[in-house]
């Protein structure tokens, strides 16, 4: 039977450690690594408001305490994963790490776990942490436990703003640690601590007897919520400080922070419920509550196709308050899961990104396969999407499309190109050439040949297995019926030279409930954000700022 518990860590940075470095390390490196573990269900940082030290505490709920003795967790503290930055940072922090087994909890009727609440709701929340040691007497210890559960917590529950009280005791996996009880009391930002109900709970005959006869030491600390970890880094605010040395990279190169006084960024990955890693880049506003725009790619490329658009968009002073989240869709890499890929799976991937990065809602922009993905996400998850722009796509795809796409897969299979870095089979030159010729206008090959060349390289290097699996999403879907019931406002966009799409997307705009428009981008084919980024950016700005 599993033993749930708590990893409870107090920290006090030395004066030599810049605050920005401390927060960047903790929020982008240390915390998310632990939240990626399946037995770590949440993690929080709190800052002291009682004027005492240590100044900071972090705690993590653990589903099975034995996991903290096993290699998966212990590896986080070894050189393979522990970076030089982590070592240098932790050398400037006084750390006290304690392990506790869970005993029980009492919660308010309307209690919602902190990790399930938006950060804007949690802000100001108070944590009262009480550490207690007792005399070595089993009967008195039993009396203490009865008092806490039968009188003390029920009386605290009458304090305005009380949310939850959770009790722990020193973990069995830490037999050398002195036996200690820890109770965490959670309160809303507006609460009755120090008021009459709280004073009544602290002044009863039973409590007086416990304090006089049973408790040998007790420390009460008061903290305020500072940060809720997710399984992927999202910290941008610290990266504007000159005190953050960068850029920084994890030892495996999969996570990077890119400091900048004007446009910091973090790059990492989110793991979906079925184990697929989705690389992403988050940049823009350093306000953690600023609105987010999610960009969803076409098939066969990565999020670099948005470079020119992002540069143009963020250069506009009106857009300084936005964050932009780009990601490489399922199928860019070889490992793309075992379930059949369809537009519902791809929509769930966007939600997985939002959840991991603790983004309640976002504006979505997508092109081609990404275009129908953002449309479908808005239809399936309307409470998570504020608005969407669907580009160069269709609302339905007949089964006959399967043969066309399978023929394209066969072209790549015949070439048998292999990556020189990973040794895996990739799409190769032949299919890349015909694909990009179809996507771009002939004029672009004459006037800006670097653009099709860049996209061709992205297509050429796409995993063949990823292409083989993800292309199935372009076969046999139909969202027209759902569009008639749409709840989220949308805009449709197409390159004016993208075949029949300027005509068929006019019908898509008519089919969407809510008077959607179609905007055409001049001098552009299938990827207007690449081929004519200024005109595409203007259309996006008009939609967002109208």
Ranges and model annotations:
Residues 399-403, 415-485:
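Conserved alpha/beta-hydrolase catalytic His-Asp/Glu region
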Residues 499-505:
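Conserved alpha/beta-hydrolase "acid-adjacent" motif
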Residues 486, 492-494:
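Short beta-strand/loop motif that positions the catalytic acidic residue
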Residues 307-365, 380, 538:
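Active-site loop/oxyanion-hole signature of alpha/beta-hydrolase fold enzymes
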Residues 379-423:
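Flexible "cap/lid" loop of the alpha/beta hydrolase fold
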Residues 1-253:
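Macromolecular interaction modules
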Residues 524-537:
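Catalytic histidine-centered segment of alpha/beta-hydrolase-like enzymes
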Residues 251-253, 262-264, 272-337:
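Conserved HGGG/HGGXW glycine-rich cap/lid loop of the alpha/beta-hydrolase fold
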